[in-house]
């Protein structure tokens, strides 16, 4: 009550910030008459002037009003677009390292030019991050004219571009690209074998377009560079033949072999199903010994394959979660409806789907480098973002990224009408109403955009409209090449466009069609008369569409996130245009079926509703929003949980990448090698001759054998002990150290100091990279099963931190030992041989990168929900870890060895 009273008196925090920024807008507007009088040359001279002032110690905030005024005037002259006052406010919010929520059509692309220009003056690079390559290239081309005119360089990065072009793009003042490409290049840079092979400078300032899509929706999707592992894919094909013989249960307690947890995207075998699966696997020869059973340690790989195959068949649907194109399974983004070429699900899921669809099964991949978008973007010195829908996720932006959301007012009032949801008994009744609404709009000349949640639904609607003779366009993952053309025409009178989720996001739907696209089609040589005719025709269409009610949005299903629904609605009513929206739902929709309260469904059935009967009530809409909030909270927990775990990896990643940077920058690593050699020899001797020990405790024979096998150095320590009666452990350690130092000195004298320095650097880099790659594989295995510790009354996160630290320490010790072993044994005759070694390694590294893949880790799938429930004390189903162990068989009714007190079949012996 007190809070609401204070808000009424002083205004909300958002309103107070806007008032404060409006004072700067007044300053910028006051400068406009002076700036307008400058000649082109004088205006362009402002850029070097600003740079000099910054070099002299002035701050960006100090020059902001004048720099914004210069950028606005330059935009008016070069692009023919002048920034509105609200766009100036948006630019200031971005400069301050916050998120600007701006409605669709408010000119976010133009807004970004203000903070981009200002921050690029520092000369440390500005990254403008977009959701796809098309938008990156489009914005770089359009806005690049402005930046180039002002004396700043612009680059754009995209997959597969030549190395020299990418180096130039990152060296530019302003670089456009996708979140994937920036992240992928960051990982590639940290696999480079020389400083010259790296692209990026230090991550200085980034503006993320559609920031909610990248930092929220894709936060559960780590960037992974992976290469093929050694395991054959044959087992996926054999297990795939088993799964269709298992039967689905209608409920958890019903008859059958497995039941589906749709909320958690998991499949669980029943008791009967476990026995049936064992029987089928034995018949197929996949399990060799009937006495061992499915749960023996040596069969854990089969459990992993069976779990993946069950999920592939029972949960993942063709034309919903993926499409099959050119003999490959291509993932469809659940948020945008776009295909994610090159991405693959992890944990064997992608191979299981390939086996299900009968396409070639590719090998499982081994992680070479990995980072989440959360940790990637938190590395920027300053981060900001813009989107049309951020306020519903304001808490997550603040808690994860430290980014405040500021809602920017629209330039003109929004007049879109958002009608209440219409709820039907089943999908048939719902789609009948959708088709009737579409046909009505088409007859009245009102353009309509229909949002669907899957390719399957979009094609089903398309087929019905085709039969009804309604002309329409379909925009989904299968038509992505025509995306820009379809969106450009979506505002034509009577146009019907069916789009999966937010495909086409980033391009405005203009009432009457895109005038800019028509001008572009005319070409630069078009006469004024031709341009005038096109403008007149467009104005007539524009007015007709406005009179018909503007763009009408139809949602065929509510998304799990309110934000995605708001994005769809936001396509209508841009810049004060008229528009309307309505969602059509049924009790058979996923959200209603899984998450909505049971009373909604019971009430509708008790009222005796028929197929085409409809409920249109604000109370129902509120219940649906309540269900969405539950899902959003659940998904936030998953993302937060992922971040908590990845923060452990991130700390280790920073250490390794910092060491690589030091190695790449160093002229010589001799001091490093000398220090490592001392540590390795001390530890080696201590294993066989413990410090402060007596000779009866020594194992000189074992020490001699190890020195020869690992370092290639025969050393007669037993003879030495016979001839020197007063020899102690410290003297032996000193003798070994002296001998090893002499061995290295001889090697250096033979090949020359320069050759030895080059060899040391090459070996250290190669061994560190190999050790890190193997460590990542161990961390993956640890991560997959760590939450099982919760059943033994242990904190999984604390256990993960402890064991991850132990693994990391072990890896560093192994790297040290391997570096010294290799340097001691390698035989090099000339510097040319070292150069050839480095070149060979570089070629192999490039080949690995070419063969590597950008992998889509479905963190919301295998184990993610169970981890969250386990952290919160829930009783989650337990997947089996993939780590193989040679242990005696445990009976299914025996107590579980983990110490939980449960039977083995209900604990670590349960299949999820």
UniProtKB/Swiss-Prot annotation:
Binding site for Zn(2+): 896, 898, 907-908
InterPro entries: Helicase_ATP-bd (IPR014001), Helicase_C-like (IPR001650), P-loop_NTPase (IPR027417), SEC_C_motif (IPR004027), SecA (IPR000185), SecA_CS (IPR020937), SecA_DEAD (IPR011115), SecA_motor_DEAD (IPR014018)
Keyword flag Chaperone: no
Gene Ontology cellular-component annotations: cell envelope Sec protein transport complex; cytoplasm; plasma membrane
Family indicated by similarity: Belongs to the SecA family.
Function as written in the Swiss-Prot or TrEMBL entry: Part of the Sec protein translocase complex. Interacts with the SecYEG preprotein conducting channel. Has a central role in coupling the hydrolysis of ATP to the transfer of proteins into and across the cell membrane, serving both as a receptor for the preprotein-SecB complex and as an ATP-driven molecular motor driving the stepwise translocation of polypeptide chains across the membrane.
NCBIfam families for the chain: PRK12904.1, secA
Protein name (record): Protein translocase subunit SecA
UniProt gene name: secA
């Amino acid at each position: 009550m007190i809070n609401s009273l204070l808000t009424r008196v002083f205004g909300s925090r958002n309103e107070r910030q806007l008032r404060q920024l409006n004072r700067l807008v007044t300053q910028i507007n006051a400068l406009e008459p002076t700036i307008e009088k400058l000649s082109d040359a004088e205006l362009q001279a402002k850029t070097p002037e600003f740079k000099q002032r910054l070099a002299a110690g002035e701050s960006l905030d100090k020059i902001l009003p004048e720099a914004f005024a210069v950028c606005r005037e330059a935009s008016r002259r070069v692009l023919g677009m002048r920034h509105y006052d609200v766009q100036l406010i948006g630019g200031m919010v971005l400069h301050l390292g916050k998120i600007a929520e701006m409605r669709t059509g408010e000119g976010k692309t133009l807004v970004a030019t203000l903070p981009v220009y200002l921050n690029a003056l520092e000369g440390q690079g500005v990254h403008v991050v977009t959701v796809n390559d098309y938008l990156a290239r489009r914005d770089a081309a359009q806005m690049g004219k402005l930046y180039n005119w002002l004396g700043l360089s612009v680059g754009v990065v995209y997959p597969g571009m030549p190395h020299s072009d990418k180096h130039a793009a990152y060296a530019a003042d302003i670089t456009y690209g996708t979140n994937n490409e920036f992240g992928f290049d960051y990982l590639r840079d940290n696999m480079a074998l020389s400083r010259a092979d790296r692209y990026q400078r230090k991550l200085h300032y980034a503006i993320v377009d559609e920031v909610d899509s990248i930092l929220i929706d894709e936060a559960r999707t780590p960037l992974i560079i992976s290469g093929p592992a050694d395991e054959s894919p044959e087992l996926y094909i054999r297990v795939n033949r088993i799964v269709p013989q298992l039967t689905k249960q209608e409920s958890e307690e019903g008859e059958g072999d497995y039941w589906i947890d749709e909320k958690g995207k998991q499949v669980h075998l029943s008791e009967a199903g476990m026995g049936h699966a064992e029987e089928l696997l034995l018949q197929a020869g996949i399990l060799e010994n009937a006495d061992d059973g499915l749960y023996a340690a040596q069969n854990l790989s089969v459990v992993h394959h069976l779990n993946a195959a069950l999920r592939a068949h029972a949960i993942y649907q063709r034309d919903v979660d993926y499409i099959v194109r050119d003999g490959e399974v291509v993932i469809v983004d659940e948020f945008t409806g776009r295909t994610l070429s090159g991405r693959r699900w992890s944990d064997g899921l992608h191979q299981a789907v390939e086996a299900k669809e009968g396409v070639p099964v590719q090998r499982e991949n081994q992680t070479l480098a990995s980072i989440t978008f959360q940790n990637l973007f938190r590395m920027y010195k300053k981060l900001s973002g813009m989107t049309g829908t951020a306020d519903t996720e304001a808490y997550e932006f603040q808690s994860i990224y430290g980014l405040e959301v500021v809602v920017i007012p629209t330039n003109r009032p929004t007049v879109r009408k958002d009608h209440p949801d219409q709820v039907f008994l089943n999908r048939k009744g719902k789609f009948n109403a959708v088709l009737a609404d579409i046909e009505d709009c088409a007859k009245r000349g009102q353009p309509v955009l229909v949002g669907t949640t899957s390719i399957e639904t979009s094609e089903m609607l398309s087929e019905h409209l085709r039969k009804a003779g309604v002309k329409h366009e379909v925009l989904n993952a299968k038509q992505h090449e025509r995306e820009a053309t379809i969106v450009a025409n979506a505002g034509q009178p009577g146009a019907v466009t069916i789009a999966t989720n937010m495909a086409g996001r980033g391009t405005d739907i203009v009432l009457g069609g895109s005038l800019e696209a028509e001008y572009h089609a005319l070409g630069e040589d078009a006469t004024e008369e031709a341009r005038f005719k096109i403008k007149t025709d467009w104005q007539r269409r524009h007015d007709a569409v406005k009179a018909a009610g503007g763009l009408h949005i139809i949602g065929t299903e509510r998304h799990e996130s309110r934000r995605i629904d708001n994005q769809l609605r936001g396509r209508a009513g841009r810049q004060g245009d008229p528009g309307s929206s309505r969602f059509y739902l049924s009790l058979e929709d996923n959200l209603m079926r899984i998450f909505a309260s049971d009373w909604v469904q019971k009430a509708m059935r008790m009222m005796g509703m028929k197929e085409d009967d409809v409920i249109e009530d604000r109370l129902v809409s509120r219940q649906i929003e309540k269900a969405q909030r539950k899902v959003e909270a659940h998904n936030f927990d998953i993302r937060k949980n992922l971040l908590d775990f990845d923060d452990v990896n991130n700390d280790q990643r920073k250490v390794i990448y910092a060491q690589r940077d030091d190695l790449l920058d160093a002229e010589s690593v001799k001091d490093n090698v000398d220090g490592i050699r001392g540590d390795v020899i001390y530890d080696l001797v201590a294993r066989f001759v413990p410090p402060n020990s007596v000779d009866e405790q020594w194992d000189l024979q074992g020490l001699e054998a190890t020195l020869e096998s690992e370092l290639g150095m025969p050393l007669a320590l037993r003879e030495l002990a016979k001839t020197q009666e007063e020899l102690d452990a410290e003297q032996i350690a000193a003798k070994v150290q002296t001998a090893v130092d002499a061995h290295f000195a001889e090697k250096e004298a033979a090949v020359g100091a320069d050759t030895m320095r080059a060899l040391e650097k090459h070996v250290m880099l190669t061994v560190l990279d190999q050790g890190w790659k193997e460590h990542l594989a161990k961390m993956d295995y640890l991560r997959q099963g760590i939450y099982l510790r919760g059943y033994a009354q242990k904190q999984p996160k604390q256990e993960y931190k402890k064991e991850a630290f132990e693994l990391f320490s072990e890896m560093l010790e192994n790297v040290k030992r391997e570096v010294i072993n290799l340097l001691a044994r390698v035989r090099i005759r000339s510097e040319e041989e070292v150069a050839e070694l480095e070149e060979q390694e570089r070629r192999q590294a490039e080949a690995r990168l070419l063969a590597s893949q950008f992998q889509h880790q479905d963190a919301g799938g295998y184990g993610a929900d169970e981890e969250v429930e386990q952290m919160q004390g829930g009783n989650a189903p337990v997947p089996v870890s993939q780590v193989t162990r040679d242990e005696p068989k445990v009976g299914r009714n025996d107590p579980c060895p983990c110490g939980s007190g449960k039977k083995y079949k209900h604990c670590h012996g349960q299949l999820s």
